[in-house]
Regions:
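Loop-centered beta-sheet repeat module
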Residues: 1-5
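ATP-binding/phosphotransfer module of carbohydrate and carboxylate kinases, centering on a glycine-rich
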Residues: 7-168
Length: 168
């Protein structure tokens, strides 16, 4: 949603429905065209293109852009609502238990949305940033245990090579 919100903010700034934002220049530079003119390209690029705009929001927010800060706050609040709902279900029978939530994906790496999310989750929730891809959990389940560091290293190397090949 962050990339989509960035596009919306840029288009709203363009037509006067929203505040000016440094996202406009950043998004248009990435798209290689004015956002208004790039709409057909955005549709062709789909979710992957839209998601690729999220880092621009984090960079603009770090630079003090109020619109970007608002995008991060709204998305963090949405995620925190999901965490609160899960927490309420998982700790229903044991309110003193710790609810561990594993966060995976680029949004949670190197700052991203993590700080805004962490300040919004209830006490007793432990946020864990995954340093492995989600498929690693399936790998561990299939092997029946947490693999040794050597096996983990080979898995990660093979995964990185496959990801590079698929994205190349």
């Amino acid at each position: 949603d962050i990339g989509r919100d960035a596009l919306s903010a840029v288009l709203c700034a363009h037509d006067g429905r929203g505040d000016a934002t440094s996202l406009t220049e950043a998004v248009e530079k990435k798209l290689g065209a004015a956002a208004w003119d790039a709409i057909p390209m955005i549709y062709r690029g789909g979710k992957r293109l839209i998601a690729s705009l999220a880092p621009l929001v984090f960079a603009a927010a770090a630079g003090g852009d109020a619109v970007s800060c608002g995008i991060i706050a709204r998305n963090a609040e949405h995620l925190a609502g999901l965490v609160r709902a899960a927490d309420g279900i998982l700790r229903r029978d044991d309110p003193d238990a710790v609810c561990r939530v594993v966060l995976g994906g680029g949004l949670f790496a190197d700052g991203g949305i993590y700080p805004a999310l962490a300040e919004r989750v209830p006490r007793g929730v432990e946020l864990i940033r995954a340093d492995v891809p989600p498929v690693y959990g399936a790998f561990c389940e299939a092997t029946g245990d947490e693999p040794s560091p050597d096996v983990r290293g080979r898995f990660m190397a093979d995964y990185a090579a496959a990801a590079a090949e698929n994205n190349g």
